[in-house]
Amino acid sequence: MANKEYPLAKFRNIGIMAHIDAGKTTATERILFYTGKTHKIGETHEGAATMDWMEQEQERGITITSAATTCFWKDHQVNIIDTPGHVDFTVEVERSLRVLDGAVTILDAKSGVEPQTETVWRQADNYKVPRMVFINKMDKLGADFLMSVGTLRERLHANAVPLQLPIGAEDSFSGIIDLVKNDAVIYKDDLGTVMDETEIPEDMKEIAEEYRTMLLEAVAEVDEDIMMKYLEGEEISVEEIKTALRKGVLANKIVPVLCGSAYKNKGVQLLLDAIIEFMPSPLDIEDVKGTEPTTGEEMTRPADAKAPLAALAFKIATDPFIGKLAFTRIYSGTMKSGTYVFNSNKGKRERIGRLVKMHANHREDVEELKAGELGAIVGLKDTTTGDTLCDDADPIILENMEFPEPVIDVSIEPKTKAGQEKMGIALAKLAEEDPTFRTYTNQETGQTIIAGMGELHLEIIVDRLIREFKVECNVGQPQVAYKETIKKHVKAEGKFIRQSGGRGQYGHCWIEMMPTEGEYEFQNAVVGGSIPKEYIPAIDNGIQEASQSGIIAGYPVINFKVKLFDGSYHDVDSSEMAFKIAGSMAFKNAMSKADAVLLEPSMKVEVVVPEEYMGDVIGDINSRRGRIEGMTPRAGAEVIRAFVPLSEMFGYATTLRSKTQGRGNYVMQFDHYEEVPKSIQDKVIGERK
């Protein structure tokens, strides 16, 4: 089956996305079961689902890395990307959407649209991905299909058009009305493979008629021929409805809504049928855009296996057995194993070791991947997320993906000295896999710092260090990097005299120290040789070393400049060391007179919240010593811009989630340093001592 050649029109590259716990992985499992890829269905709550293949995912029952899987249904090849629903992992969703042609959004029938659904939907809008919705968990207490459809319209402003209605709900959910065919499907067994196609039950004929009329009106909006027939009261065939629906979905004008219970195996085959009938093939989407690496001029590539190669590496993962895997979407051309490709972002040639198609965590080796296919490459050395692979004779750079800056950082150290190098290698590998994770060394404390998108994100990173890389480590509390500066222009003396038999030490200098906006500056204004030239650099060094630890709380001193204007020396006792000490003494004396103050990092914060929570959120920002800069409306929400001290932003993600019922999100980045109020300064000094 897998070796059969499929024409591009019979390819479907789709993502399955949802809020955490809407039943997305379960739905994917059922799809794999019905398409004959798995022989036993894995249950998420037993920790055995095929798609969730990292240990942490099986324990937590959530999906963290998006696994790309190939399966087959009704003579079509379907490539499915399972994406995580937790807010800390939106980067995975962002990457998946970049390489998909269509998406299935799964909602929980008792909750409808949830916060992460909104985030993912906005991301899909950016990439203009055609979508359909599967309302899952119809068998659960509180399941309400029509309420869920309502939330799609109200919260996402989607033109949601039901193609089905459930027969019964909760325990009595027994089948589905197909509004396109105008009949019903009643399930007869637990695996959902035995079903009866029958007439619509008598007690539901009226509501079915009402919703079928709404369906016909929606397709008439996108197809003029149907509009004419509809207005003239002519019969519209099932085929005509399907063709018009497909047209509406591809133009992002219609969002078809289906229902079922993946866990109870109801509605999944109908979902598969709809994916094939209404989701785009690689031929239906626009040719992929890119730029010529040297000239920067825009170019496109068609979805054609005979065209020059253009492929995008959208995820890097490390497999314990075969090493680095680069998950790749081929947009045009053909990639063959054992050949060379050109990485146009890095300007390097790379050799393709093997090409594999993934089924969750099982692999199938293939000789080639063609336009429209998704697969993983083994053997690439320099390729990272977002890189383009192409022919060096026909280079192209596909548009790069933009990833948010990390917003939280903590210090990390190995439990043993021997673990230091091992930890460094492991962190570099993890940073390569995940562009929203950063690692660096704090120059002031020498600590290794890891930064990421949220607390769960960093927890999972630390967890992977322990499990995959066998590095035991201690993790600190999130920290703020304070600085010190001066406010007054002062003069000060530094005099170091040491006489203890034999040769003594003598260094003496006078400096002026003044505040400045820029970097540290040292000016030598000594005239008449009161300090010999060879000792001047020693004074500069002494001042710079002393400035690494200020007099308020021992933080580095910034934004000052020094003018050396006088001093004296001794023919025998003067030395570089003596003048270095004199320089540091002059600096400390000057600082004690110059109104020294503590500075803290001020962050530029943007919060996106639905209007009804705005008052609460603004009040909370003010209570964090925030300064509101402005507000602008954006698609049913408000964007609040403010400057807030970093020390007040710890734990903000959790507060924002609870204040907005999870519907708000925010980004922050460092903007500038500013003076700390006296009361806070005293508190910081107290904590340092």
Swiss-Prot record:
PROSITE patterns: G_TR_1, G_TR_2. It holds the Pfam family EF-G_D2. InterPro entries: EF-G-like_DII, EFG_II, EFG_III, EFG_III/V, EFG_IV, EFG_V, EFG_V-like, G_TR_CS. GTP binds at residues 18-25, 82-86, 136-139. One of its GO terms (cellular component) is cytosol. Its main location: cytoplasm. GO terms for molecular function: GTP binding; GTPase activity; translation elongation factor activity; translation release factor activity, codon nonspecific. Keywords: Cytoplasm, Elongation factor, GTP-binding, Nucleotide-binding, Protein biosynthesis. Residues 9-283 form the tr-type G domain. It is found in: Cytoplasm. SMART domains: EFG_C, EFG_IV. GO terms for biological process: translational termination. Belongs to the TRAFAC class translation factor GTPase superfamily. Classic translation factor GTPase family. EF-G/EF-2 subfamily. Catalyzes the GTP-dependent ribosomal translocation step during translation elongation. During this step, the ribosome changes from the pre-translocational (PRE) to the post-translocational (POST) state as the newly formed A-site-bound peptidyl-tRNA and P-site-bound deacylated tRNA move to the P and E sites, respectively. Catalyzes the coordinated movement of the two tRNA molecules, the mRNA and conformational changes in the ribosome. PANTHER family: RIBOSOME-RELEASING FACTOR 2, MITOCHONDRIAL (PTHR43261:SF1), TRANSLATION ELONGATION FACTOR G-RELATED (PTHR43261). This is Elongation factor G.
